[in-house]
């Protein structure tokens, strides 16, 4: 999974298979690979066919409201634990919740890298007339 900074992101997973609740909200636990920092947010499943896959909108922004599917993440790699909880819940603590999936995530900047073009090569062609 990939999250781009300062944009709306759709995270696709299969939480229905391991879940036990009907029409749950999902608690996302983001654990940064390099330092173990944990960040949480709640996502609402917006997929049309929840039996096949689940789709949650997660907005990456600087001043998030974690209970509205918003999160602030630094660039890098994360382990994401996804838990189900009762619809309408604003709980940001995974204790006692059912984990439905674990995924890897990369957070990257939305700015496109600058391509540098090299023009120092010879533009003449040598032809052998043998």
Where are these regions (language model features)?
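Short, aromatic- and glycine-rich surface loops/edge beta-strands on solvent-exposed regions
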Residues: 26-29, 72-88
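Solvent-exposed serine/threonine-rich low-complexity stretches and specific carbohydrate-binding patches
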Residues: 37-53
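Beta-strand-rich interaction surfaces with strong enrichment in secreted/lumenal proteins
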Residues: 1, 42-46, 68-69
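Short, surface-exposed beta-strand/loop "edge" segments at domain boundaries and coil↔beta transitions
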Residues: 35-39, 64-66, 87-92
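A structural detector for beta-sheet-dominated domains
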Residues: 14-16, 31, 60, 83, ...
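Signal that preferentially marks extracellular ectodomain short beta-strand elements
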Residues: 55-75
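Short beta-strand elements
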Residues: 86-130
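N-terminal "first-domain core" detector
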Residues: 1-37
